[in-house]
């Protein structure tokens, strides 16, 4: 293993062999490895000049230093129990040794709707594993493992490179300077994930606390647990494209003053507009043209798509039973998981000030937009067109 690590050390300019061994762990189940941050080879604009970790998460994490990200995760863990008026269990930190022989201090905990988080603190490295497929309340397969509790956990929303990641910062929590960061996306069946849990384990996790989510259309936690994860997974795109899309997801949310920033573990008011900023789930020809024109990706198809033809995403012969999906951009639609804040923002975007809509459940939303577009008429003209 150390012989394999030497070329990797030279290529990535790592400080010690231990760093290479930790980065190379579980390479068979990794989708890609991206070195990001300032002065990093993969840190092109806009990834290089943003402190946000380009991964779809409920709240933004930090790519420039491990401490804000660890704080966000622990803060979200504590807030989750506080919102349910529960006493958080004490964190159990253990001194362990990884398969490569390096010692670390580690812990793990479940943060709904993010999933299972594992933290490893090495002498000169900080490693965080995030498996967002683990959710014993909303991502359980009711038909799997009923007769055999020892059977492997079968979930509806499987592990995916879009949201299952391993993050490595070169440095410890007390370093004052910015740290190089590696973002390793993990495929289904990765270590430290859902494949290591049985149905009995999931049952124990589900019974460890009350149901942590609210009602459909009212709770952003539930919206992220179901809509966001199902809306971003199974994307046949390269690592850099996934990173740029995740960055757009966070940038929209973080620009709203009521939403959390880096180092804050509370939930935003909703995710509908962030998903709109994220763009099409499987990519599109229009988005590829824009990324090429802004020189974020190269001109070749392999710079944008990844294994698209291998998995038959674009069928050559139309088949109504297996239609696949189109390369081109489609209209964005809101779902039943959209929160009232989401609907209000959409009304403000689409309707002139004073116009309103009434939803199926009888709630009325009136546009409060202060900007009047040139191609729009007054409210009276808008109502006259409707009557006509």
UniProtKB/Swiss-Prot annotation:
Belongs to the spumavirus protein Bel-2 family. Pfam families: Foamy_BEL. Bel-2 expression is low. This is Protein Bel-2. GO terms for biological process: positive regulation of DNA-templated transcription; viral process. It comes from Simian foamy virus type 3 (strain LK3).
